[in-house]
Swiss-Prot record:
Intracellular or extracellular location(s): Nucleus
Pfam families for the chain: KRAB (PF01352), zf-C2H2 (PF00096)
Protein name per UniProt: Zinc finger protein 1
SUPFAM superfamilies: beta-beta-alpha zinc fingers (SSF57667), KRAB domain (Kruppel-associated box) (SSF109640)
Species of provenance: Mus musculus
Mapped zinc finger ranges (C2H2-type): 182-204, 210-232, 238-260, 266-288, 294-316, 322-344, 350-372, 378-400
Family annotation (InterPro entries): KRAB, KRAB_dom_sf, Znf_C2H2-type, Znf_C2H2_sf, Znf_C2H2_type
Coiled-coil stretches noted in the UniProt entry, renumbered to this chain: none
The KRAB domain, residue ranges: 7-83
Family matches, as CDD domains: KRAB_A-box
Glycyl lysine isopeptide (Lys-Gly) (interchain with G-Cter in SUMO2) cross-link site: 73, 113, 143
Keywords, ordered alphabetically: DNA-binding, Isopeptide bond, Metal-binding, Nucleus, Repeat, Transcription, Transcription regulation, Ubl conjugation, Zinc, Zinc-finger
Length: 402
């Protein structure tokens, strides 16, 4: 980008004559000050700041440019006026005077040290007066016997926290008039709406007011309950546009879509199979290592996956929460109910590409394909005989055990 000419405060200043100024009503004068402060803030934000928080330029130059923004409540205009503005701003408010600073400009040492103790200090008090520049929000003044003059009033927001040097006071006043912050009394986090604060506080209190009417599991947020209930209803609103596969949660769809994008960065060192997520690789590697870290405390049966253990434990508890609305038969898993429903509807979504035969279950299609291909993946460790089905291998192994 080519070099741009430097912009001074004069370039963005609008001057009035004394007669013109006196014809402005209070709201117009406030607007004028807002615009001037905005321009001033924008110029400051692009300055080169030193490590100690000072601006690299002659402070007296700023004094000449900014002039005077004095606000004296219920008093006639002061005779002192800045050389650039051409008049003194007199507003019927409680703004701190910018002109009270000594000529040598303590401003840079005290007020605009944005990384100084001024920013970290929270020793401030809300001062009620005519409000925040006519917008109805009181400003925060530093709680000191002799408050610093200058821009201190723009340094704090409604949470007692310092605004950055890029935040002009005009933004603070207008935003504060629209958004009242709600502060968490546990962690000081702030929110735009009270409902968000109420919801957030449940993290600290542990409150879970939303209960599933099917399994009585409770949740702190209604959105989480809605997501959970999809397990019971079988609803899968998130569909892959590539293959049509549907998912209960959007996060699962995002993971699935990586398969289409061929982003599987996690590879198995044993067989070379790749996975989209690291936990999938970790689970897969247990096939090679034989590790089964999840054990049933009822029968001591072990499992590769925790989800398989949870499903298995329902056999012991007798829990069957998924009921068929057609015949009343209940099932441990929702997937079992979906398959069962096909007996009523006659749906057979899985088709053999070789012969066109259809099946209600994917597993049945796989078995059918093995018959056609002659594949026998289940091999006996004793004699080497292979089978197309695992159940037939189990029956065969009894011969060796006899």
């Amino acid at each position: 980008m080519g070099s741009q000419g430097s912009v001074s405060f004069t370039d963005v200043t609008v001057d009035f004559t004394q007669e013109e100024w006196e014809q402005l009503d209070p709201s117009q004068r406030i607007l004028y000050m807002d615009v001037m402060l905005e321009n001033y803030s924008n110029l400051l934000s692009v300055e080169v700041w030193k490590a100690d928080g000072q601006v690299e330029r002659d402070p007296r130059d700023l004094q000449r440019q900014v002039g005077s923004l004095t606000t004296i409540k219920n008093q006639p205009p002061t005779e002192e006026r800045g050389s650039r503005f051409g008049k003194t701003l007199t507003l019927n408010t409680d703004f701190v005077s910018l002109r009270q600073v000594p000529y040598k400009y303590d401003l840079y040492e005290k007020t605009l040290k944005y990384n100084s103790d001024l920013l970290s200090s929270r020793n401030c008090v809300r001062k009620k007066g005519d409000g925040c520049g006519g917008f109805g929000e009181p400003l925060l003044y530093l709680k000191q016997e002799k408050p610093h003059a200058g821009l201190e009033y723009s340094e704090y927001n409604g949470n007692g926290r310092a605004l950055s040097h890029k935040d002009a006071i005009f933004k603070h006043r207008k935003i504060k008039s629209l958004v009242q912050p709600f502060v968490c009394n546990y962690c000081d986090k702030t929110f735009s709406f009270k409902s968000l604060l109420v919801s957030h506080k449940r993290i600290h209190t542990g409150e879970k007011p939303y209960e599933c009417d099917v399994c009585q599991k409770t949740f702190s947020h209604k959105a989480n309950l809605i997501k959970h209930q999809r397990i019971h209803t079988g609803e899968k609103p998130f569909e892959c546009p590539e293959c049509g596969k549907a998912f209960t949660h959007q996060s699962n769809l995002i993971v699935h879509q990586r398969a289409h994008m061929e982003k599987k960065p996690y590879g198995c060192s044993e067989c070379g199979k790749t996975f989209a997520q690291k936990f999938e690789l970790t689970t897969h590697q247990r096939i090679h290592t034989g590790e089964r870290p999840y054990e049933c405390n009822e029968c001591a049966k072990t499992f590769f996956k925790k989800s398989n253990l949870i499903i298995h434990q329902k056999i012991h508890t007798g829990e069957k929460r998924y009921e068929c609305s057609e015949c009343g038969k209940s099932f441990i898993q929702n997937s079992q109910l979906i398959i069962h429903r096909r007996t009523h509807t006659g749906e057979k979504p899985y088709e053999c590409t070789e012969c066109g035969k259809t099946f209600s279950q994917r597993s049945t299609l796989r078995l059918h394909l093995r018959i056609r291909t002659g594949e026998k993946p289940y091999e006996c460790a004793e004699c080497g005989k292979a089978f197309s089905r695992k159940s037939r291998l189990s029956v065969h192994q009894r011969v060796h055990m006899a």
